[in-house]
Structure formats: structure tokens, C-alpha cells
UniProtKB/Swiss-Prot annotation:
Residues 665-682 have a biased composition (Acidic residues). GO terms for biological process: rRNA processing. The gene is dbp10. PROSITE patterns: DEAD_ATP_HELICASE, HELICASE_ATP_BIND_1, HELICASE_CTER, Q_MOTIF. It is found in: Nucleus, Nucleolus. This is ATP-dependent RNA helicase dbp10. The keyword Nucleotide-binding applies. Residues 915-932 have a biased composition (Basic residues). Residues 360-515 form the Helicase C-terminal domain.
Length: 932
């Protein structure tokens, strides 16, 4: 009987059951009979199919059940198959990494790549330049370390570093070095750390030892590059970690100088939490056709996010914040459950006895994929002074609070963020600069205490909540001066603007921009509590004063809103619905509150028909000055008629002269003070443009350009040289400032870096001064001692009082970088030259020079002569004893033999002693001298 043909390969949606059907067939070409004999006893009884005696519907049902069971077993997860190692799809195994690196990744504890790792590692493996936007805690360090180790593989015997990682701070560089060592355990790659504060001589020895990977801060690496005249032509892999902080800390000149010395064939990676304009320009100049990698969750607002905007006065912001925390979020006061649990463990004595073991177990038990607490809230403030003030105020209210801002110490910031992520605190008060690098996977609420000046910043703030299919809330406090920015945001999001209860209960917080006020009673109680705290606590009152001064600088430097939104905001703020009760407070008591608010609004808006002079004269019953009363009535009548004519002219201008985009319905909405949805306006504009004729356009634009007064006619005649038929403006006619400042959320691809970077670019204002993010400080300052202006660059790079020299790129660098210490080090080590890039390395050169073996540094026992004793100093006796002790040890500096040496010259005493010893030896031996 001929052998049965092998079954075809399974398709994507099907599976093969022929092995179960023909498991007793020994003529199969795929398996040997011996193997089948071994597998035959393992066959399950239900898989025995009887085709002779069967039939009917029961067999069909059995077949369907069998196929379903087989399919379920094929789709079973690999974790359920005990005793088998199944390769998981979509993990690190599918990225083509070597076995040693996969073992190191598993040992590190990584099982599934994070979103930023899943997007960047395949692109980096294809040798493309990458600009990745990722926050701290999202796994970006492993995202560039894993491809680097995969590319470098092992230590190279040729001289020259091949990988360079630049970090903004010493702490981040140490953290990166730790990750490199852990992931590179299966290789012999050498990694060195070059940061400020360490000995230059030791770093000379490290660089002489031919490292493969250099992890450094820009200032110290540039110092070594200039001092040692390093050749960077061998570097293949360059990483700028947290590039926005690199530029913020003033390393732009150092980065430009370092970038100039790198080869053009390098692969450059740039990771940043945000993209300032200066960083985009740097990426365009230093990277070759880069790919922008950006997570969707960081560029779009989640559809599950619900937004609420509250109109408040400047003096009621603190009370409004307290009302939101107490009554809307219902934030609990006192220590959290995590803080109480930690306190109990510390009290029980476990922490003192098993401190290290407990710390490891707690870190493993914490699941950062889950929400720290169900009330976890981030509050965004404008400056660091606001952060300090709100932190003190919230602590006084009894909330568990953490804080962070840009100039906060790195260790303190890490502790504060760790407390928030682990649930020890419920509230985190931050600035935009400090929060751009903090990654909180799941967040419940976001509060904008100070409304952002750009729509991008709003998206960046609220993008931290409503992730992974969960719902989230954002609450924003909007003052009257913030209304233009709110309208810019409404245009940018393309959502309907709802003021108060003008649409009744038909509002959607996830799709509308809903604005309203707080209940008056609840807000007044919160404001009274805040005022009482300010009166009782002097420190908090002083912090509020400092915060108000910082707010003036912040308002002076924030971006201006669009002109159209500024005009619209006047009408919106003046409407009664601006301060109406917010639809979020929709219950029986809120209905009574709404009626009460209307009554108070009518009372507050009452304007009598008579002036105070007329009322007084009418009450007295003696019109003493009839002439004055007549004059007042005549003036009032004239003013009323002027107001009436102005309103009629305005209504005619809106109805006839101004061309609308979305037809008569939108024009009516504009008269009523409501603003239509941007999508509807876009559809109406498209319909109008498709039906409009040349004559209609000519009439429309000519009526729009007609001057309305003599001044306008004069200006029009001055610019009459512009022929509207041929004139081309340098700006498009449909320019929207809100969209130009922001980016399109629902459009755009990352294929073009110029377009993608323009969409993602965002500048943040500084949180402690008037200087904006990425803006250079004043280049000169007044030197009181020398009575002249000097460069501030000397203060920033540590070379104050010294001159500057030009580097290879033409940029000015500190002259102290060329101090000659490397030449003195080589002379002390008796080295004429070090191996150049491309030559074979000298075995053990770096280890012999600095006793650096196996990553351990051995302490030397060098002795030096003390300073000579000065009789005029107070420590003369002490130094004299030190000199006498040094002379006794016979150091060569004071004459005589060195310690442990032997003098070649013999004196009379030495000769006499030698003769006596020789005579004693003769007597001891008692042997006569030999005579020949």
C-alpha cells in the first residue's frame, strides 16, 4: 500500500487533526514506526474514532466536540503546559536577540516588552536613527541598551570605544551603568562611567583601558575629549538620554561640540519626554532621516476621559481645589493603607531584622500596572512656589501628599514619586517641567490648578489618566483671564462648548467642553477654611505671598492666546451661563441652588432707570434743581439712543457683512453666544465651497473689504496697490492660530520626521523663573569686582574667571579643559604614547596603570614627605614631629638611603663590624686556614 502523503501546513485560521485520525498508521512519511509505537500508549480514549458502526447526528456532534477540543488545546497558553518550554510570540524572543542576551533579560525580570520597547527595538535593529518620546519608568533605558549589546556583541581588541551614552545627571548615569552591567553579564563588554566629581587621573586610566561603552555626562566627557584629544571616529552607537533635560541644564554647547567629533556613519538615538523646538532643531542637524517613535496614549486624549471645567475667581482657587478634593473626588484624609501597613511592619520589628529581604519582597509585591490608589490624583501648578504652597496647604488639610518640581534634588524627587506610586500618598503636586519625565501607568484624576497655555500641554497632562480601557476624570480651574486659552482648547479638540445648563441635562463630559461654576455654599465654606488657615499659619501665608509673586513672572512669559479666542472670550465671560451651576452637580439640591443663583444674578444685574440725584429729589418732594435734573435726563436719553444704534449696527454687521462657514444656523448660534462643533463647521464650509461661484466670492470679499468710516477709507486707499485678483499673501487665508500652535490629533503620520516633529513639538515654561524652557539665559552679567560685563557661560560650565577658547566645531569652550593634566599623568606613568584608534590594544594597559582588575579598585600605599615646619605657624611642633619621623624612615627627600634600601658605601664602623663578625665565624668553626 503506498504511503500516505504528508498533511499540508496549517493555514492561519485552521489546524491539522490528521495525526489524531491516523495515529495507528505506521506508513506515514513524517514519523518513524518506533516513534509512533512510543507515542501510541499516550493516545487518549476519546480520540479513537469508529467510522463503521457510527452514523447519524450523534457522530456529527462528537466530531464537532472533538474538533473544538483539539482547537482549544492548540490555542492553550504556553503557561498552562507544564514541563514544556514554548516560545512566546510578541516578546523579546521574536526580536532576533542572541541567547546570552535573552538569558540576561529573563534574569533581569523582563518577560514582555513595554510599549516603547516594542516600538523602538525593531527600528533600532534596522540601523535607523530614532527620536523616542518616553517618560521615566516606561522602560526606555532597556529600549536602547538591549540593541546596543546585541550590536556590539563582545569586546573588541581594536582600540576605540564603540558606544556612547550621554545622561544629564550623575544619578541617571549610574542607573544606566547598572542596567548595562546586568544585561551584559553574558558578554565581555567593558563599560566605564565618566561623571563630574571623580578623579581625572582615574578616568584617564579607564579610557586608556580601551572600553567598549562610555556612559558619561556631557561636561566631563567634553573635558576628557579636549584634554586627552580623544578620537571618536570608532563610535557606532550614540544615545542622548533625557535630551530635554540636557538642553534645559545648559548642555547645548557641549552637545554640539561632541556631535561635531562623531563620525557621520554613526547611529544616533535621542530619547526625551517632550520635544522642545530647540531639541527638534538639534535632531534635524545631528540625525539622518530619523524616525519619531511616539506612543498613541501620549499624543491623544482617551475617549474614556471625562473633562470638567470650572469657572472661578482668582481669590477662590484654593477653596475650589479643596471643594473638588472633598466633595467631587471624595479624597480620604489621614495616612493611606500602604502607609499604615508600612508603619505596622516597622513597629513589629521586621524591618530591623530582615531589612534587605523585606525590601526586595515589597518591591516585587508592588504592581505598578495597577492604580496606586483609587483616589490617586495629580495636581498641576504653574511654578515651584505654587507647588510648595499647595503642598503645605494640603498637608494642613490632612491629605497624604507628595510633591516634585524641576530644581528638586534627584534623590528627593525619586522618594516623593516612589511614595505616590506605591500608594503611601494619594496626591502628587507637580509642575509641567517636573512631570514630563514621570510615568504613572494608571491614574484616577488630574487637576489643572493653573490652566495650561497650550492645547498640547493639556493633552500631555490629561494623557496620564483613562488608560488601558479605564475611565478617568480631569478637573480644570478656569479664571476669566484663562477663557481665551479654554476657547483655543475647544477649537483644537473640535468639541462643543457647553456653558452652564443652557443645554439642560443633555451633556456628555467625554465629548463636550462643559463649563460651569461651583455651588455657592460649598465654595464659600472651603474659602472660609482656607482664609482661617492663612490667618493662623504664618508660614503658609508667606508661601502664598511668594507664589503670587512667582505667578506674575509666569503670566508675563506664557504664550498669548489667539486673537479670535480673545474676542470670543469677552462674550463668553459676560454671559450669565459662564458662572451658572455646573451640570456635574446635578441633583435635587442643585436644582434649588440653580434657582437661587438665578435670583442672585437678577438682583446683581438690576440697573435702576433713574440716577441717584433723581431718586433723592423725588423722595424729598422738593425739586430744588430742576435744571440739573433735566440735563441728567437729556444725557441719559442720548446715551440710550447711542447704545441702541450701536447694537442695531452690530446685529446688521453679523447678519449681512460677515461670511459664515456653516450657514444660517451657525450664525444664529454665534448671536446667542454658543459655538458650534468644529466638525460641523468643517462640513458646512465644505458644502459652501462646493456651491459658491466666482461672483458670490467676489461679492463676499468685496463687501468684507469695504471701509466703514473715513479712517478705514484712508487706510484702504493707501494699500490700494494690492490687486485682490493677483495678490498672494504670505499667510494662508484660513490660518487658525489654535491649530497652528497645536497639532492634529486625528491625522498625520510619522513617515516624515519634519511633519511629525512639528506636531509633537512643545515648549514648557520654567517652574521657578521667567525664563522659558529651552531659551538661553542672558549672555552677559555685571562683574562687581572688575567693573565690567562678563559672560554667563563661564559661570555655568565651571570656568568662572577664566578665558574661553574655540573648539573643533567653532563653539567656545572653557580654556581649563586644556590644563595639561593628561600630559602630566602620562609623564608620571612613563608613557610616551597611547595606542591610537584602530590599532591593537595593549593587554592589561588600563589595569596596570590604575590597578583596575575585574572592576575592583585597589588602594595604593604611597608615602610622601610632609611639609617643612614653619616656626611662624601654630602647628610648628606637630609638623616638626612629622618631619623627624619622616627622617627616621629615611625618605630619599631628606638624604640617606630610601626605606628598605642598602647603601653601597661603607664607613670605618662598618668595616670594623665586618672584621669582628668574620673573626667570630673563624673561632666558631675552629678550623685552621688552608695552606697551599
Amino acid at each position: 500500500m503506498p504511503g500516505r502523503a504528508a498533511s499540508p501546513a496549517m493555514s492561519e485560521n485552521e489546524f491539522d487533526i490528521t495525526n489524531a485520525l491516523f495515529q495507528n498508521d505506521s506508513d506515514s512519511d513524517n514519523e518513524a514506526p518506533a516513534k509512533q509505537a512510543k507515542r501510541q500508549p499516550k493516545a487518549a480514549a476519546p480520540q479513537q474514532l469508529d467510522f463503521l458502526n457510527g452514523g447519524g447526528d450523534d457522530d456529527d456532534e462528537d466530531d464537532e466536540a472533538f474538533i473544538a477540543e483539539t482547537q482549544a488545546s492548540a490555542n492553550r497558553k504556553a503557561s498552562n503546559l507544564k514541563g514544556r518550554t514554548v516560545k512566546k510570540g510578541g516578546g523579546f524572543q521574536a526580536m532576533g536577540l542572541n541567547a546570552n542576551l535573552l538569558k540576561a533579560i529573563t534574569r533581569k525580570g523582563f518577560s514582555v516588552p513595554t510599549p516603547i520597547q516594542r516600538k523602538t527595538i525593531p527600528v533600532i535593529m534596522e540601523d535607523q536613527d530614532v527620536v523616542g518620546m518616553a517618560r521615566t519608568g516606561s522602560g526606555k533605558t532597556a529600549a536602547f541598551v538591549i540593541p546596543m549589546i546585541q550590536k556590539l556583541k563582545s569586546h573588541s581588541t581594536q582600540v576605540g570605544a564603540r558606544g556612547l551614552i550621554l545622561s544629564p545627571s550623575r544619578e541617571l548615569a549610574l542607573q544606566t551603568l547598572k542596567v548595562v552591567k546586568e544585561l551584559g553579564k553574558g558578554t565581555d563588554l567593558k563599560a566605564v562611567l565618566l561623571v563630574g566629581g571623580d578623579s581625572l587621573e582615574e578616568q584617564f586610566s579607564m579610557m586608556a583601558g580601551n572600553p567598549d561603552i562610555v556612559i558619561a555626562t556631557p561636561g566631563r566627557f567634553l573635558h576628557l575629549k579636549v584634554e586627552m584629544n580623544l578620537d571618536l571616529s570608532s563610535i557606532r552607537y550614540v544615545v542622548f538620554d533625557e535630551a530635554d533635560r540636557l538642553f534645559e541644564m545648559g548642555f547645548a554647547a557641549q552637545l554640539t561640540e561632541i556631535l561635531h567629533g562623531l563620525p557621520s556613519t554613526r547611529q544616533t538615538l535621542l530619547f526625551s519626554a517632550t520635544l522642545p523646538k530647540s531639541l527638534v532643531e538639534f535632531a534635524r542637524a545631528g540625525l539622518q532621516e530619523p524616525t519619531l517613535v511616539r506612543l498613541d496614549t501620549e499624543s491623544k486624549i482617551s475617549p474614556d476621559l471625562q473633562n470638567a471645567f470650572f469657572s472661578v475667581k482668582s481669590g477662590d482657587k484654593e477653596g475650589a481645589l479643596m471643594y473638588i478634593l472633598h466633595n467631587v473626588i471624595k479624597m480620604p484624609t489621614g495616612p493611606t493603607e500602604a502607609a499604615q501597613r508600612m508603619k505596622e511592619e516597622n513597629a513589629s520589628g521586621k524591618s530591623s531584622k530582615f531589612s534587605k529581604k523585606r525590601k526586595r519582597s515589597d518591591d516585587k509585591a508592588i504592581n505598578f500596572k495597577e492604580s496606586p490608589t483609587k483616589h490617586s490624583t495629580i495636581i498641576f501648578a504653574a511654578t515651584k512656589h505654587h507647588v510648595d504652597y499647595l503642598y503645605s496647604l494640603l498637608n494642613e488639610a490632612g491629605f497624604a501628599t507628595s510633591y516634585a518640581y524641576g530644581s528638586l534634588d534627584q534623590t528627593a524627587r525619586k522618594i516623593q514619586v516612589h511614595n505616590f506610586r506605591t500608594g503611601i500618598s494619594n496626591i502628587l503636586v507637580v509642575t509641567d517641567v517636573a512631570a514630563r519625565g514621570i510615568d504613572i501607568p494608571i491614574l484616577a484624576n488630574v487637576i489643572n490648578y493653573d490652566f495650561p497655555s497650550q492645547a498640547k500641554i493639556f493633552v500631555h497632562r490629561v494623557g496620564r489618566t483613562a488608560r488601558a480601557g479605564r475611565t478617568g476624570w480631569s478637573y480644570s480651574l478656569v479664571r476669566d483671564s484663562d477663557a481665551p486659552y479654554l476657547l483655543d482648547l475647544q477649537l483644537f479638540l473640535g468639541r462643543r462648548l457647553v456653558l452652564g445648563r443652557e443645554h439642560g441635562d443633555q451633556v456628555n463630559f467625554a465629548e463636550d467642553v462643559v463649563v460651569g461654576g461651583f455651588p455657592r455654599d460649598g465654595l464659600s465654606q472651603s474659602c472660609e477654611w482656607v482664609n482661617k488657615v492663612l490667618d493662623d499659619t504664618v508660614d503658609i501665608a508667606a508661601q502664598r505671598s511668594v507664589a503670587s509673586k512667582g505667578e506674575k513672572l509666569y503670566l508675563r512669559t506664557r504664550n498669548a492666546a489667539s486673537l479670535e479666542s480673545a474676542k470670543r472670550s469677552k462674550e463668553v465671560v459676560s454671559s450669565d451661563n459662564w458662572t451658572a451651576l455646573h451640570p456635574l452637580f446635578n441633583d435635587e439640591t442643585s436644582q434649588l441652588e440653580a434657582e437661587r443663583e438665578k435670583m442672585l444674578a437678577r438682583i446683581g444685574g438690576y440697573r435702576p432707570n433713574e440716577t441717584i440725584f433723581e431718586v433723592n429729589n423725588r423722595r424729598s418732594g422738593k425739586p430744588e434743581n430742576e435744571e440739573a435734573l433735566t440735563t441728567i435726563k437729556r444725557v441719559r436719553t442720548t446715551l440710550d439712543s447711542k447704545k441702541k444704534r450701536a447694537q442695531e449696527a452690530k446685529s446688521e454687521f453679523v447678519d449681512d457683512d460677515v461670511p459664515t462657514k456653516s450657514g444660517d444656523a451657525d450664525a444664529d448660534d454665534a448671536e446667542d453666544g454658543a459655538f458650534s462643533d468644529e466638525d460641523e463647521a468643517g462640513e458646512g464650509a465644505a458644502d459652501n465651497m462646493s456651491l459658491a461661484s466666482e461672483s458670490d466670492l467676489e461679492v463676499t470679499f468685496s463687501s468684507y473689504n469695504q471701509p466703514s468710516n473715513k479712517k478705514a477709507k484712508k487706510e484702504a486707499s493707501a494699500t490700494s496697490f494690492q490687486n485682490p485678483e493677483y495678490f498672494m499673501s504670505y499667510t494662508p487665508n484660513n490660518t487658525n492660530m489654535a491649530e497652528d500652535r497645536a497639532y492634529g490629533v486625528h491625522s498625520g503620520t510619522n513617515a516624515n520626521f519634519a511633519q511629525a516633529s512639528r506636531d509633537a513639538a512643545m515648549d514648557l515654561l520654567g517652574d521657578e523663573g521667567s525664563r522659558g524652557f529651552g531659551e538661553p539665559r542672558t549672555m552677559m552679567r555685571w562683574d562687581k569686582r572688575h567693573k565690567k560685563y562678563v559672560s554667563r557661560q563661564n559661570d555655568e560650565d565651571g570656568s568662572k574667571g577664566t578665558r574661553l577658547v574655540r573648539g573643533e566645531s567653532g563653539a567656545k569652550i572653557a580654556a581649563s579643559f586644556r590644563s595639561g593634566r593628561f600630559d602630566a599623568w602620562k609623564k608620571g606613568k612613563r608613557l610616551t604614547r597611547l595606542p591610537r584608534v584602530g590599532e591593537a590594544e595593549t593587554p592589561g594597559l588600563g589595569a596596570d596603570l590604575n590597578h583596575y582588575r575585574g572592576g575592583r579598585r585597589f588602594k595604593h600605599n604611597k608615602e610622601q614627605a610632609p611639609k617643612r615646619a614653619d616656626p611662624l605657624r601654630g602647628d610648628y611642633d606637630k609638623m616638626k614631629k612629622k618631619n623627624e619621623a619622616a627622617k627616621e624612615r629615611q625618605l630619599g627627600k631628606f638624604g640617606g638611603a630610601a626605606a628598605g634600601g642598602k647603601s653601597e658605601l661603607k664607613g670605618t664602623d662598618d668595616i670594623r663590624l665586618a672584621r669582628n663578625l668574620k673573626q667570630k665565624r673563624r673561632e666558631k668553626n675552629a678550623r685552621p686556614s688552608r695552606k697551599k
